[in-house]
């Protein structure tokens, strides 16, 4: 599913929304950088941004905006999100997911599917949710994840209201609970997993997560990063061969001039931006988990 654009050339000059399937262990900014560099490889400069950060250990739908469409990213932020989650019972972790070691092991063999479904049903509706310590939320001018790295814990973290529209437990396999959730903007699925474990009295953490939808946009309509790169380069190649591809030609000429003037300084700035954003992403900046 792609946004409409006004260009009649191969490369949409007004920009577009790209629906991508984020791979495991990639940060959201890894994806943005890859697409941005693809345009650059084709000789075009394009703004590229994304809506709704996914943690490195999550996969699924990541919506990118290019060109003028980056100004419309805010229109996507408030959309509900759907996830498929795997929750492991019988242990907790400091980050509420697989990023930190298991602690507080508790036997969970007595927990039945009916018990989990009953507990999950109680979560449906509006509720207050505290951000996890391993998150980019602020406390007295400092990121929570920065405090967590120092071994500090803020007990009274500012909670915000979220809505869990649906919490469907599909099946269990040993200590693993498989479920589908539809939640409002800003919901941390890993916090829901931790709270479910507490409600069952055995502890739990998020063992796997895949985002399947953002509002009306679905992962079934998404492309892989490599397919998106191939499509962009193909569009640029077609545009180069068209008499009407004047805009792209001017962009390429301007791009080469700017690159020549900027030289290594631009390269260094880009590398620094990638490094900084990777650190932020891996610390769950604006994470929806």
Curated annotation (Swiss-Prot):
Ranges of compositional bias, category Basic and acidic residues: 265-289
Protein name, as recorded: tRNA pseudouridine synthase B
Disordered: region residues: 243-289
Keywords for this protein: Isomerase, tRNA processing
InterPro entries on file: PsdUridine_synth_cat_dom_sf (IPR020103), PsdUridine_synth_N (IPR002501), tRNA_psdUridine_synth_TruB (IPR014780), TruB_C (IPR032819)
Recorded name of the encoding gene: truB
Pfam families: TruB_C_2, TruB_N
NCBIfam families referenced in this protein's UniProt entry, alphabetically: TruB (TIGR00431)
Isomerase in keyword set: yes
Annotated source species: Chlorobium luteolum (strain DSM 273 / BCRC 81028 / 2530) (Pelodictyon luteolum)
Function: Responsible for synthesis of pseudouridine from uracil-55 in the psi GC loop of transfer RNAs.
């Amino acid at each position: 599913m792609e946004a409409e654009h006004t260009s009649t050339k191969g490369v949409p000059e007004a920009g577009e929304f790209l629906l991508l399937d984020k791979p495991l262990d990639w940060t959201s900014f890894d994806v943005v950088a890859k697409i941005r560099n693809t345009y650059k490889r084709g000789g075009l400069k394009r703004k590229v941004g994304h809506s709704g950060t996914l943690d490195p250990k999550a996969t699924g739908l990541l919506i990118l905006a290019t060109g003028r469409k980056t100004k419309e990213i805010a229109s996507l932020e408030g959309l509900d999100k759907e996830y498929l989650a795997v929750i492991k019972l019988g242990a907790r972790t400091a980050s509420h997911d697989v990023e930190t070691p298991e602690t507080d092991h508790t036997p969970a063999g007595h927990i039945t599917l009916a018990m989990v479904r009953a507990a999950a049903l109680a979560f449906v509706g509006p509720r207050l949710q505290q951000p996890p310590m391993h998150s980019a939320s602020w406390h007295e001018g400092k990121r929570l994840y920065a405090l967590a790295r120092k071994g500090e814990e803020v007990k009274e973290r500012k909670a915000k209201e979220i809505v869990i529209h649906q919490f469907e437990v599909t099946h269990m396999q040993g200590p693993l609970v498989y479920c589908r959730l539809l939640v409002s903007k800003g919901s941390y699925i890993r916090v829901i997993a931790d709270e479910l474990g507490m409600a069952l009295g055995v502890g739990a953490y998020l063992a796997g997560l895949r985002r399947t939808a953002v509002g009306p946009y679905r992962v079934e309509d998404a492309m892989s990063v490599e397919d998106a790169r191939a499509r962009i380069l193909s569009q640029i190649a077609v545009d180069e061969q068209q008499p009407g591809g004047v805009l792209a030609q001017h962009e390429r000429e301007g791009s080469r001039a700017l690159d020549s003037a900027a030289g290594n300084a631009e390269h260094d700035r880009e590398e620094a931006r990638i490094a900084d954003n990777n650190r932020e992403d891996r610390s769950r900046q604006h994470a929806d988990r």
